[in-house]
Amino acid sequence: MFSRLRAVTTPCTLTCRRVHLKEKGKPLMLNPRTNKGMAFTLQERQMLGLQGLLPPKIETQDIQALRFHRNLKKMTSPLEKYIYIMGIQERNEKLFYRILQDDIESLMPIVYTPTVGLACCQYGHIFRRPKGLFISISDRGHVRSIVDNWPENHVKAVVVTDGERILGLGDLGVYGMGIPVGKLCLYTACAGIQPEKCLPVCIDVGTDNMALLKDPFYMGLYQKRDRSQLYDDLMDEFMKAITDRYGRNTLIQFEDFGNHNAFRFLRKYQQKYCTFNDDIQGTAAVALSGLLAAQRVINKPVSEHKILFLGAGEAALGIANLIVLSMVESGLSEEEAQRKIWMFDKSGLLVKGRTASIDSNQEPYAHAAPESIPATFEDAVNKLKPSVIIGVAGAGPLFTHGVIKAMASINERPIIFALSNPTAQAECTAEDAYTLTEGRCLFASGSPFEPVKLQDGRVFTPGQGNNAYIFPGVALAVILCEARHISDTVFLEAAKALTTQLTDAELAQGRLYPSLANIQEVSANIAIKLAEYLYANKMAFRYPEPEDKARYVRERIWRSNYVSLLPDVYDWPESSLTPPQITEEKLPH
């Protein structure tokens, strides 16, 4: 049960030194950052005032991890498992990350999507201990003092949400705090970013969810969401407060903002701060990587595909924009690339002159209407004959049997990406995709699905297009290189780096992404490739530039093994402490 991270990284010499403490006794056990539970050594117990406060047995971290897994197996409810796992984080941080890294493939769906969505919905009912910073619109003018209340002095990564669009669940207000917390857990578990350098933040400007406003257990402001200039002023004050305290190169990741605000803030802050939006850019990199992997199977470049999106929000537009960037790199003009992409939303096909409104972000993909405008998504598939369909609408199973069969009749190897989260919002199941296309489709999903066995005995392992393949590695590279801005090309390079790590054997299984079991190695390799890219393109400001980027990255990956809490104790050479012999001399009378 040894962490896979230990097998793929060199010894961490820069982030795992001995911890020197000022406090002693019970406070050490109450602090999750220093608590080892029963694994405190005898010397630590004796010298740090812990002797007698614990049972006499001294355990290893391996035994503690085994106890956790045995307890977890007794639980059947995903929410019960979530509460148990996050409780470990509140008590023993290193053990939490040890068990998460040991079994990331099975625990990630509990710590993050899809279970985190359920946890967010129940946030006020399962609340145990506050995590992160809560900043409300009533705090305008005082945000810096709130940021100063955070006890850590060396934060390098912030994940912030305003709770308006939590996964496919809508406006959850402050209940959305579960998303930044879960996201930063993956920063550490997948990329080895030190947990004390991570800060989750929830911006509370109210909620339009009437059920929450009527809930006596709701924990946010009891007011409708403020969409006035005051909201923008609060965000400006927040960005300034974070960077004033922690530096201009502090990474600030935006998460689950509403569509309009997500694009608006990305445009507003991208060139001013070190920031990105995972829903737009991270999702885009994962989707593009899946298309690049499909290219290896069917030998058809991304630039030759016709792509139809179900959904025209921030995820769809982010993916489309990055695909265009990739196509332009392949030699197409921007206009030619945009013409290969169509979108279908709740108002129908995105075309010029339609009755429903089209915002400025959607305009490049609003094409001239065909002779007969399709009324349904299935009609659009039959009319446009795409080679790729990508679902990011979060509206449930809209890749109907008719849609999947149409894709199978149009294409020898149809590409079907059902990327919406959580599982209940997925556009189709892996079983439907593989069965209805007789195993010919190249499938990826946003939520995990079990392997599918067809009647002829073939087994396909669906690839999960999880953003966790991208954002931890991007964050690690940006932090270590001290980048000040994050361009879209960084995500293009991340998509390429992810694709190269997919083996031929995994492709043969139907996977378009590497196994999540290897996520630590995947993230490290992405960070190394991006470090090389950032320095080569003058986007890195950490000097002197490390000659060996791979070694530089791997030496700074945080590890979850316990370290000594005792001060350094060592011997000096005996010869250096032995004075010369004093010879007796005659004293004068």
Swiss-Prot record:
Location within or outside the cell: Mitochondrion matrix
Residues the entry annotates as binding fumarate: R67, R91
Matches recorded under SMART domains: malic, Malic_M
Cofactor(s) for this UniProt protein: Mg(2+); Mn(2+)
Transit peptide (first-last residue): 1-18
Cofactor note: Divalent metal cations. Prefers magnesium or manganese.
Main location: mitochondrion
Positions carrying N6-acetyllysine: K156, K224, K240, K272, K346
Gene Ontology molecular function: any one: malate dehydrogenase (decarboxylating) (NAD+) activity
Positions contributing to NAD(+) binding: R165, N259, A312, E314, A315
Keywords, sorted A to Z: Acetylation, Allosteric enzyme, Metal-binding, Mitochondrion, NAD, Oxidoreductase, Transit peptide
Residues the record lists as binding a divalent metal cation: E255, D256, D279
Catalyzed reaction equations: (S)-malate + NAD(+) = pyruvate + CO2 + NADH; oxaloacetate + H(+) = pyruvate + CO2
Residues that bind (S)-malate: R165, N421, N466
Any one Gene Ontology BP term: regulation of NADP metabolic process
EC number, as in UniProt: 1.1.1.38
Function: NAD-dependent mitochondrial malic enzyme that catalyzes the oxidative decarboxylation of malate to pyruvate.
Family classification: Belongs to the malic enzymes family.
Other noteworthy facts: This isoenzyme can also use NADP(+) but is more effective with NAD(+).
Subunit structure: Homotetramer.
Protein name: NAD-dependent malic enzyme, mitochondrial
Species this protein is from: Mus musculus (Mouse)
Phylogenetic lineage: Eukaryota, Metazoa, Chordata, Craniata, Vertebrata
Gene that this polypeptide is encoded by: Me2
